[in-house]
Amino acid sequence: MRIADYSVTKAVLDRHGFTFKKSFGQNFLTDTNILQKIVDTAEIDQNVNVIEIGPGIGALTEFLAENAAEVMAFEIDDRLVPILADTLRDFDNVQVVNQDILKADLQTQIKQFKNPDLPIKVVANLPYYITTPILMHLIESKIPFQEFVVMMQREVADRISAEPNTKAYGSLSIAVQYYMTAKVAFIVPRTVFVPAPNVDSAILKMVRRDQPLIEVKDEDFFFRVSRLSFVHRRKTLWNNLTSHFGKSEDIKAKLEKGLALADIKPSIRGEALSIQDFGKLADALKEVGL
């Protein structure tokens, strides 16, 4: 029997008198086939350390621990720590860290792996309400996570992996794909969770690029330009840029010059621009003094 078997999950929750907290976005997976598929997608083996976020009662952790060198599981809910100590008692390669992943000192934590030089992969069932902040926090950290295989709301997975000229494409697509390749591996129906969420989930596989997709003069400015270009999706690039930078004659002259330098039409919408286009635009706007 597995932790994820519905009868085992129910017995564990009943034994510990556990009640779900909406504020933590808790939905526990009760399908062992999907858990095995997650591990297979992440290609976990004895030469890999894993960071898991939100282990719950240890359903995914069990599968990870059977395959990885070591698993470090970050759990924010104090009430789950003794439950994890119970369900994972047979594993000596699991560390449960009772901390918010957004506040944890990850540089220090990863040194606690028995072999900290092994590649690190992030595998997680992320709470819907905080998926994007966690992902961006990890991606932008200086820790060389090799790969992310994460479960999230299907809509967010579609946005992250979206291509230009699609409804899902936006600043989040650009922010992630600048650093990583991103592809939806498979869909997870809402019916395999306790309690069942209101929407389906997706497993997103992201692999870190050897270097960012493009080279830009100023990364912060590049991300700023991409974000502001989608503030009003139906507005033209020109309208979004002037709404942000201003509408004085001097500013408009600089914007016109920058757009011409980047060879981008002011009448285009942000969703039509590739990441490479945004790189050219940001560099050009920087060059003209914006």
From Swiss-Prot:
This is Ribosomal RNA small subunit methyltransferase A. It is found in: Cytoplasm. SMART domains: rADc. NCBIfam families: ksgA. S-adenosyl-L-methionine binds at N27, L29, G54, E75, D100, N125. CDD domains: AdoMet_MTases. It catalyses: adenosine(1518)/adenosine(1519) in 16S rRNA + 4 S-adenosyl-L-methionine = N(6)-dimethyladenosine(1518)/N(6)-dimethyladenosine(1519) in 16S rRNA + 4 S-adenosyl-L-homocysteine + 4 H(+). Keywords: Cytoplasm, Methyltransferase, RNA-binding, rRNA processing, S-adenosyl-L-methionine, Transferase. Belongs to the class I-like SAM-binding methyltransferase superfamily. rRNA adenine N(6)-methyltransferase family. RsmA subfamily. Transmembrane segments: none annotated. Its main location: cytoplasm. InterPro entries: KsgA/Erm, rRNA_Ade_diMease-like_C, rRNA_Ade_Mease_Trfase_CS, rRNA_Ade_methylase_Trfase_N, rRNA_adenine_dimethylase, SAM-dependent_MTases_sf. GO terms for cellular component: cytosol. Specifically dimethylates two adjacent adenosines (A1518 and A1519) in the loop of a conserved hairpin near the 3'-end of 16S rRNA in the 30S particle. May play a critical role in biogenesis of 30S subunits. One of its GO terms (molecular function) is 16S rRNA (adenine(1518)-N(6)/adenine(1519)-N(6))-dimethyltransferase activity. Its EC number is 2.1.1.182.
